[in-house]
Amino acid sequence: MKFRVRDGVAVIVLASPPVNALTHALRVELDHLLDQLALRDDVMAVSITGEGDTFCAGVDVRQMDKLDDAPSLRTICQKIENLPVPVIAGLRGMVLSGGVELALAAHYRLAEASCKLALPEASLGLLSPAGATQRLPRLVGAASALDILLSGRPVTAEQAKLSGLIDGIVTGGIRAATLQFAEHLITHKSPLRRVRDMTKGLRDPKYFDAIAKARKTTERDPLRVKALYIDAVEAAAMLPFDIGLEFEEERWQQSLADPQSIALRRLFAAEHQLPADMVTRDAETRRRVLGPKAQDILKRLRRSQVIAAEMMFAMGRSKGAIDAVMIDYGFAQGHFGAEPEQVSPQDRTEITERLIGAIAGEGGRILQDGLARRAADIDAVAVIGMGFPRWHSGPMHAAREIGIVHLREKMRDWQVESPVWTVPRMMDEAAKYLMGFDAISVQRP
């Protein structure tokens, strides 16, 4: 982090390459500086910008479970908001997650025309942890806040200006513009504009209509965290700000411990750590394209799923029942394309376990053959290539969700019916560990 005082303006530049992530070290440094600034009488405004091409890209997903380590991002944001002088955030590049929450804590927000802002935590099963659910509705109302929070879609600078999320778009360099604006605020003795004290968005007569609409449209959404977001945005209009922050923190902790979020974060890491020979991106569409080795893995996984579905049908399960279970589990469609039927809880459990057992069993054999080094690589391929539901993190993790020891015992009973349920040696090995298949790493030939 870089810091200096110029003509009464404390100039803070976040410097944590390559994207100014809010690491624990940066939070400690920023926390200490904010404590000092609160006591200085020679500082009349504060400018916060980022080094390089982006303001701040938030927190590394792999460090989310350490986000509450002191000083927490929530504490940092509260200290920024409570400073006795105007604080201006100068935004550029793709501002993500904690970077957006940092900006919301400032009293003013400026952005370059090419800047985009996004809060994509919902896609990871997480609630935004540092005040976004309480500050954002105060600025833009419930409808816009929920759209930003639930969709995770980037908001352009122009859209942000129209909604009230930012105060202005600059045409020159953001650092110079932010400093100039700070000097303007000092000259005109402009008052503080703490978002916590704003009520414009909360006074929207359609605020609670937006809440009700969001509940209606997400009632069948598989991501459980979306209900927590809606509750938190509703709380913003019903509770004092500080109590609202406590409400948000409780839901943040709930989302952090949710197995669905754990699965989604694991998958996020797996997708970003796939070996280069397994996945590339199409130059034009930017879509992920599986390489030859990943395609070989995919063919084997698909084959095991097909055999399991066909075997269950041959043994008397209806096509509609099998498809209903697959769709309810999260697949876009069933194997047979049949009309889904009502399925008893007992039958639902068995169909699910037979499907996951077959696919994960083949995954174990893929590990044995050295075609993949890690179970997470197999899971990423399954999600990318065969539409395996993201919130289950792939078949190898899904086996752990069911219980590998339990699933292995079931497969030992089923393997007489078809080799697709043969228990692989790697499943015996995975059953020894709490982390299941994730505890196993093999050398690829």
Each language-model region and where it sits:
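Conserved CoA-thioester-binding segment of acyl-CoA-metabolizing enzymes
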Residues: 1-51, 71, 75-78
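N-terminal glycine-rich phosphate-binding loop for ADP-containing cofactors
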Residues: 1-4, 15, 27-29, 67-72, ...
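Amphipathic alpha-helical interaction surfaces in cytosolic regulatory modules
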Residues: 53-66
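Gly/Ser-rich catalytic serine loop of serine hydrolases
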Residues: 93-99
